[in-house]
Amino acid sequence: MARISIPRPIELGVGWFLVCLFCAGAIRPLPAAAERVSRVIDGDTVQLEDGRKVRYAGINAPEQGDPYSQEATQANNDLVGGKDVILQFGGSKKEKFERTLAYVFVGDTFVQGELVKRGWAIVTRTQPLRRYRKLLQDYQEEATAAGRGIWAKGEHRGKLVVREVHPRIAGKKDPNDEYVVFENAGETRLDLTGWLISDETSQPPYVVPQFALDPGKTFTLYTGSGKMTADALYWGRRKVVWNRGGDTVTVRDASGHYVLSHTYCSGGKVCP
């Protein structure tokens, strides 16, 4: 497969990479030297020779134990294992697990772009550098359409869609003020029993109980508790699930295969 070249205005060569700034004031200076990868942990995390763990910004790969996790880890290893990488930062350099958060390059290869384009990772809302959001979304659409990687066995792909995301309004205490509306955009009835719905975090996903959705019909997944109906499901959580500043709604079928990935920005709006 052809390499993905770093998009302009970043296509500058490694030498210039080490001294230039992108969008003055928005991006921190790049490191003075490349860093060697000593270990590939999973599909979106590596460890450097100095012991630091680097989490790839802007994407999520399947978690260990999930379908395709081994394939995603191998794809990442093929790209960066034992190689020198250049890290590009924007905004916070740390995430909640104290791993370094960065965009990663091997020569002129944009590692996140390769993983998404090959279908081994999905795009997330967390984009320290917004210039990559559209690029990664385009790669994901290409991978989805081509049925690559995690999208290869998505027989339900494109049939279930997100129509609305309503994060909880600040100050509201009712967890059911937060919800996601899904629609069956296909032509056949969908048996959603056992399907998994999750956000960008590593918290356990919502497992859909016995439930089916006819073509053209919608259902709402509320964060709080309530009685299930033909068009309403309840997660049973008390705390916020969907981040007001933006998040990603991911749905997998009962076999763990990816059905959809919907990223939204502040207030549930579509990202620009």
Pin down the residues of each PLM region.
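Small beta-barrel nucleic-acid-binding modules, primarily SNase/OB-fold domains
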Residues: 3-6, 11, 16, 23-272
